[in-house]
Structures are given as structure tokens and as C-alpha cells.
């Protein structure tokens, strides 16, 4: 059975971009006769507020987007994340990083077209000699308690097919770099928490904005490390030794098990449910399952008149403002359905009424400007 999820961060009121994502995710799962679960990603201790989360749930119900089962709160799952971080550490794939954002920005220019900087491994164990002096300068007068924890990634290509944007081949070292899995303040980073929760909650379909497209290869690789069977891990031991020795020579991966398992080579580990994980859906999961059967669907972003993606600072687009104007949920859904290409007019409609009309083939790939 398809199990989709909506995983918002409760750092403010939902805006139309969030609702657009929730609607497409709900329609995609429900049109297949599946479940749709809610996970509250309240990992940021400074910005996440329970009141925002409760308001978010009220907004979803008001819109006609009910979820299955009880919501899962990431802030309550620290012990689970600790366990999986330890697994990565035991593999020799994590290291403390002393670099600040300013350090990173000062040593390299933005690499990706969206302005992101790909971390080049300054603090990686046994770095090439040109990096060593810089690292020693960074560690002066810094306590290990102020470090982030990064995951060592291989210099290899992850192939995957997005259900809406098609095939991609992403080189982890070039486009992602060694990424943070625990912040220096102790908070859990997005990638680790998401991968663990999606696997343990039995999520089979991930729908989100195209700005997170590059998270897919990172998460596929991390799933491989955490949930691949022991026998398959042995096949990739040589690759990990090369990584931790700092050998970054580019190579063509002909055996996908050296980087990520293929459908033919995969021997998935059966993952037993643990106490609390049944909260993810009505009645919970009833058996072991493979955490690898995940489909990704990314959607275009809703942007303001200046072409910038909507954010929680766009107050005229948030549900607090919109509900205050007296607009109905059917009007909001009707407008979003029209923008998604599901209908030919903005006629008010409910999510349930949209189910027979839904198809990913109708959804545009270009970002959508709100005027």
C-alpha cells in the first residue's frame, strides 16, 4: 500500500506554497488508495513552536486534508536518531567539523546555481596536506562541544528517477559534499532525521518542492548505509576504506552496490517495528518491511510576483491572513488545483472531489508565479 507523508516544520503559519505541497501529496497518496501520515519536524529548538504545530493541524483539517493515525513529533525521537548516528560512527563514516558558516564561505564560492556552498571536507579525517594548516587554525580555542557532525560521502554517482522530473545522476561529492547530520547545538539535522523516520514509518512516497530535489541522492545513500543488509555492506567495504583514507579520485561505478544498491543486487534488511513507530498510521504497520521502496515526486514552487519562492514572511499568502478575509477552503483548493493543472478554472472544489482528476502528468514542471 502507498503511504505518503506531509512533514512540515512548525516555525510559523502555513502559506500557499505549503498548502500546495500538502494538497499534491494528499492527492498522490489517496488517488492510489493509500495512507497519508503527518510528521511534525520540530527539530529546531529556537524556531519550532507547539502552537504553530497545533494551528497547522487545524488548517489541514479546515482545508479538508485529514491525515491517517496520530502525528509523529520528531522532537520526541532523539533516542532513535542517536542509535542510528552511532551506527554511522561505528562504520567510521562521521567526523567532527569545526568550520563555521563564515569559515566555509570565506574559503570557497557558491557552487550550485541556487547559491548553496558544497562543503569540501576541510575537517575530514586525513585531509590532503594543503587543507591541514587551515584545519589546525580552526581548532584553536574551540571545544569539541561546539562542533557539528558530518557524514563522509563517496565520490560516486547516485542514479534515481523522480516521478515528475525524470531521471537524474547526481555525484555526491561534487553536488552535495560531506553534509551535517547533527548540529553543533546538539539538534538533529534534517537529512538523518528524515531518512530514519521515513524508513521506520514505512513511507513509500515522498512528495515535496523541487528545491529539495538534491536531497534525494543524499537520502538514498544514507538509507543504503543505515538499512542495507550486513552482506551488502561487506561488498562496499573497499569503497568506504578509500573514502576514509581521503582518496577522492573520480571513478565510474559499475557495481551499484559500491555506492547504492540496484534493484537486482539489493538484499534489503527487514526492519522490525519499535515502540512508538505505529503512531505513523491508522492501526500501525503490521509486518516487517523494506525501507527501500520509496518513490520521489517533486513539484514546482509557488513564487511571489518577484519570482521568489513563497516563504513565511509573505504574510499576504499565509493562512492566517487568508482565513481572516473570509475565504473558504474550497476557494483555496480550487485556485491551487487550477495552478497545478488539475482543473481548467478556479471553481471552488474540495480535495476529495479532485481525486478522480489527479494525475502527475497534468502538473507543470516550471515554477508558478502568483500575481
Task: Report the location of each language-model feature.
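Active-site cores that bind ATP or allylic diphosphates and position pyrophosphate for catalysis
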Residues: 102-134, 138-230, 269, 290-310, ...
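Intrinsic disorder/low-complexity segments
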Residues: 128-146, 228-293, 371
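N-terminal Rossmann-like or analogous alpha/beta NTP/dinucleotide-binding catalytic cores
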Residues: 1-112, 211-227, 331
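Short helix-capping/linker segments at secondary-structure and domain boundaries
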Residues: 29-35, 201-202, 227-228, 340-347
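Catalytic adenosine-cofactor/nucleotide-binding cores of aminoacyl-tRNA synthetases and other
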Residues: 100, 214-215, 289, 293-371
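Active-site neighborhoods of enzyme catalytic cores
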Residues: 52-134, 141-175, 348-371
Amino acid at each position: 500500500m502507498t503511504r505518503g507523508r506531509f512533514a512540515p516544520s512548525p516555525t510559523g503559519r502555513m502559506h500557499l506554497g505549503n498548502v500546495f505541497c500538502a494538497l499534491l501529496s494528499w492527492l498522490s497518496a489517496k488517488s492510489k488508495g493509500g495512507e497519508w501520515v503527518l510528521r511534525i519536524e520540530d527539530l529546531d529548538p529556537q524556531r519550532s513552536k507547539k502552537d504553530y504545530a497545533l494551528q497547522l493541524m487545524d488548517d489541514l483539517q479546515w482545508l479538508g486534508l485529514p491525515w491517517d493515525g496520530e502525528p509523529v513529533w520528531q522532537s520526541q525521537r532523539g533516542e532513535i536518531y542517536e542509535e542510528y548516528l552511532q551506527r554511522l560512527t561505528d562504520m567510521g563514516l562521521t567526523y567532527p567539523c569545526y568550520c563555521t558558516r563564515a569559515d566555509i564561505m570565506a574559503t570557497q564560492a557558491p557552487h550550485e546555481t541556487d547559491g548553496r556552498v558544497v562543503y569540501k571536507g576541510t575537517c575530514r579525517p586525513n585531509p590532503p596536506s594543503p587543507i591541514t594548516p587551515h584545519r589546525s587554525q580552526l581548532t584553536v580555542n574551540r571545544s569539541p562541544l561546539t562542533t557539528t557532525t558530518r557524514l563522509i560521502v563517496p565520490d560516486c554517482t547516485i542514479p534515481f528517477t523522480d516521478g515528475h522530473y525524470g531521471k537524474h545522476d547526481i555525484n555526491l561529492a561534487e553536488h552535495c559534499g560531506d553534509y551535517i547530520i547533527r548540529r553543533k547545538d546538539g539538534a538533529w539535522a534534517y537529512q538523518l532525521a528524515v531518512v530514519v523516520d521515513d524508513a521506520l514509518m514505512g513511507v513509500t512516497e515522498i512528495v515535496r518542492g523541487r528545491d529539495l530535489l538534491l536531497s534525494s541522492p543524499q537520502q538514498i545513500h544514507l538509507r543504503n548505509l543505515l538499512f542495507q543488509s550486513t552482506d551488502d555492506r561487506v561488498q562496499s567495504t573497499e569503497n568506504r576504506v578509500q573514502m576514509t583514507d581521503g582518496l577522492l579520485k573520480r571513478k565510474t561505478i559499475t557495481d551499484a552496490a559500491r555506492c547504492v544498491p540496484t534493484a537486482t543486487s539489493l538484499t534489503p534488511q527487514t526492519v522490525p517495528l519499535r515502540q512508538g513507530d505505529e503512531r505513523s498510521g491508522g492501526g500501525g504497520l503490521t509486518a516487517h518491511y523494506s525501507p527501500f521502496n520509496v518513490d520521489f515526486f517533486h513539484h514546482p514552487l509557488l513564487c511571489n510576483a518577484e519570482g521568489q519562492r513563497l516563504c513565511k514572511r509573505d504574510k499576504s499568502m499565509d493562512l492566517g491572513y487568508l482565513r481572516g478575509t473570509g475565504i473558504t477552503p474550497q476557494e483555496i483548493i480550487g485556485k491551487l488545483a487550477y495552478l497545478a493543472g488539475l482543473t481548467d478554472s478556479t471553481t471552488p472544489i474540495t480535495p476529495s472531489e479532485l481525486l478522480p482528476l489527479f494525475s502527475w502528468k497534468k502538473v507543470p514542471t516550471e515554477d508558478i508565479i502568483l500575481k
